[in-house]
């Protein structure tokens, strides 16, 4: 190796890195799947935030339209996605439905995240009997299917917007708790934690200043994936008749169950909210997968190969081949 090559190698070694989060952000923006997910989520958030400006009236405003030989007018210039069996504009209800889906998803994930962080931190760092007690309770909650658990909670509390938030939030608690506990256990015996203990740093300071910042990455990824799951759970509860009962609260799952009798004569009434659910869930899943690849050291560098070798990356086709058959 020549002197010039040695000097260039030394300069490359001495060049400072941008830090974990900055490097992860650069990897994330180079991931086309994550970019597509961010675009879909941006559409979802835009529809939710600016629904009053983009909608054609209110969500329960009825338009009396006479249709010969049919029940519901199809898409038209005045009503882009048609109207339902009660004369309500479907486009308007989809926009307002995005608002309520986003609200329920954010609140429910926040409930599960906050409680799960507390329980997971205590279980992972304290250990012993406290760890066993908390984890056995989490195991009992995880033994019940999530949607069935949410149905039981809503049946106990009664149908409604706030009840759904609580139900979906409780379902997410054991997921975040177990995830953070495992991440803390992996970080607890690292050298920097042992060094902090050796110099007499207090245990709460070690937990909040040294362990949690390094253990939070999987929780962030799970938070985006939990948003997708929350949207599905909310739609499922609404489809079963446990969603908001107020007609002014259009929820996508409730919109699906309201048009069961019109699937043959007006199929767009079910297709439109179904597509809205698919797009929003796909967006959050793609962002979550992109964050996982950006933050997980074991997956770094795979995004580029996956993009080059798989033309159907957004559907997950060709992943195993793109990763060398692993």
Tell where the protein language model's regions lie, with residue ranges.
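Transmembrane alpha-helical segments of polytopic membrane transport and secretion proteins
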Residues: 1-39, 288-326
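Cytoplasmic juxtamembrane interface segments
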Residues: 22-44, 200-221
